Swiss-Prot record:
The keyword Kinase applies. This is Glycerol kinase. It catalyses: glycerol + ATP = sn-glycerol 3-phosphate + ADP + H(+). Pfam families: FGGY_C, FGGY_N. Belongs to the FGGY kinase family. Sn-glycerol 3-phosphate binds at residues 14, 84-85, 136, 246. The keyword Kinase applies. GO terms for molecular function: ATP binding; glycerol kinase activity. Its EC number is 2.7.1.30. The lineage of its organism: Bacteria, Pseudomonadati, Pseudomonadota, Gammaproteobacteria, Vibrionales. Pathway: Polyol metabolism; glycerol degradation via glycerol kinase pathway; sn-glycerol 3-phosphate from glycerol: step 1/1. Key enzyme in the regulation of glycerol uptake and metabolism. Catalyzes the phosphorylation of glycerol to yield sn-glycerol 3-phosphate. One of its GO terms (cellular component) is cytosol.
């Protein structure tokens, strides 16, 4: 009997760094987590300290090993998944960042984006990167650092500076500066990567004044990039063998590796990704085209849509309206009534995301009558999350021409059985909830394990993807269509609110 080996996933998120150790049956053996500082230098700006990201991430690996009594020489490989778009620029000679990491949420580069739009680059960005010209993505963040940090542009042009998303920074640190790489999924979120030719886009680098020498080499999401001694005693060298951005790692962890397979992560917002296989689909409905992973970690195309308010709308019921003590109580109260009594809640608190992209829409409750109570409003709020998910999935199916096979789900809100059943009814599609909901870490671990032969094939992994529950649609077509029509009317009310204000003026 050979000694038990394990895979570790490093999950570097927006608020914390985690290490998750898995065994051969994909059971979680040990988890360690450390939060780190959120830095807000001014309104709309968000930063992290790259050295703190590194310190918290490396210490979680040591801690996860110590907690479980697993030795470093029992690790078959390390997989990395990370918050996407967050941008780090560092000096390759000193290993020191020239500025804090500029986080994906940071809006400081809005003016740079407007300038690029005025130069007619919007269509070029959409056609070649699959993205919209927005401060969310890495490209304008790199330009900002080069333009605003003293000496940065000169050093960059002299070949002294390197750029990376968080995955690149971690691999560079773990290999003592020997390896400067990223994977296709992270590269596709920079707004600097051509997803048609699968290479850095020279025109966009030139337009933003970014030297090509700063860019990491782009590799598949499943291969050995280098080896590390991190957490290792003496000469133990552990292969770093998997990299994927968090949403793409979740897509892979859910085994959505073929065209038409999709997942929804129900967090603060909702992140929907649909694998479209080897065919690049350009959205006509405000979705992003991005790169994901095929069965062997090779690049595949995907459509991505985000809903701004998912679980956050339940927090609003708890914190602001105070009609819930805990978010988990929402299921109990929603099932105290048979219907939402004609009420629709459109949680457009910060506008509407895909497929509407209406920054001026505002939250709306419509259909109120004297018989409506707090349970109806709680139920309608949960239903609103499911309707928004249908809005995005309808757009994905229209864009791709691919019928959704089923919806795989993960994230905190999937514990809510009422929401999951209603989601199935609204979509007229099966909803699959996995037993292990740590799908982001699973995805990174699977990619790493396949690269080193820890698992032999995607088929072996499919067998490990045990479902906790399958929700099947119950509604008849007439009822489903009538409800959804009502939702569309409610959304129109949310969108008309600001237009009416303009007319009053």
């Amino acid at each position: 009997m050979t000694e038990q080996k394990y895979i570790v996933a490093l999950d570097q998120g927006t608020t914390s760094s985690r290490a998750v150790i898995l065994d051969h049956d994909a059971n979680i053996v040990s988890v360690a987590q450390r939060e780190f500082t959120q830095i807000y230098p001014q309104a709309g700006w968000v930063e992290h300290d790259p050295m703190e990201i590194w310190a918290t991430q490396s210490s979680t690996l040591v801690e996860a090993l110590a907690k479980s009594g697993i030795r470093s020489d029992q690790l078959a490989a390390i997989g990395i998944t990370n918050q996407r778009e967050t941008t780090i620029v560092w000096n390759k000679e000193t290993g020191k960042p020239v500025y804090n990491a500029i986080v994906w949420q940071c809006r400081r580069t809005a003016d740079i984006c407007e300038d690029l739009k005025s130069r007619g680059l919007e269509d070029y960005v959409r056609d070649n990167t699959g993205l919209v010209l927005d401060p969310y993505f890495s490209g304008t963040k790199v330009k900002w650092i080069l333009d605003n940090v003293e000496g940065a542009r000169e050093d960059a042009e002299a070949g002294k500076l390197l750029f990376g998303t968080v995955d690149t920074w971690l691999v560079w640190k773990m290999t003592q500066g020997r390896v400067h790489v990223t994977d296709y999924t992270n590269a596709s979120r920079t707004m600097l990567f051509n997803i048609n030719d699968l290479c850095w886009d020279q025109k966009l680098l030139d337009e933003m004044g970014i030297p090509a020498s700063m860019m990491p080499e782009v590799k598949r999401s499943s291969e050995i990039y280098g080896k590390t001694n991190i957490g290792g005693k003496g000469g133990t060298r552990i292969p770093i063998a998997g990299i994927a951005g968090d949403q793409q790692a979740a897509l892979y962890g859910q085994m959505c590796v073929e065209a038409g397979q999709a997942k929804n992560t129900y967090g603060t917002g909702c992140f929907l990704l649909m694998n479209t296989g080897q065919e690049k689909v350009t959205s006509k409905n405000g979705l992003l085209t991005t790169l994901a992973c095929g069965p062997k970690g090779e690049p595949a195309y995907a459509l991505e849509g985000a809903v701004f308010m998912g679980g956050a709308s339940i927090q609003w019921l708890r914190d602001e309206l105070k009609i819930l003590n805990g978010a988990e109580d929402s299921e109990y109260f929603a099932t105290k009534v048979d219907t939402s009594n004609g009420v629709y809640v459109v949680p457009a608190f910060t506008g509407l995301g895909a497929p509407y992209w209406d920054a001026y829409a505002r939250g709306t409750i419509v259909g109120l009558t004297r018989g409506v109570n707090s349970n109806h409003i709680i139920r309608a709020t949960l239903e609103g999350i499911a309707y928004q998910t249908r809005d995005v999935l309808d757009a994905m199916q229209a864009d791709s021409g691919i019928k959704l096979a089923n919806l795989r789900v993960d994230g905190g809100a999937v514990a809510n059985n009422f929401l999951m059943q209603f989601q199935s009814d609204v979509l007229n599609t099966e909803v699959h909830r996995p037993q292990v909901t740590e799908v982001t870490a699973l995805g990174a671990a699977y990619l790493a394990g396949l690269a080193v032969g820890y698992w032999n094939s995607i088929d072996e992994l499919q067998d490990k993807a045990v479902l906790d529950r399958t929700f099947e649609p119950h509604d008849d077509e007439e009822k489903r269509n009538r409800r959804y029509k009502g939702w569309k009317r409610a959304v129109k009310c949310a969108q008309t609110w600001s237009e009416l204000h303009d007319e009053d003026d």
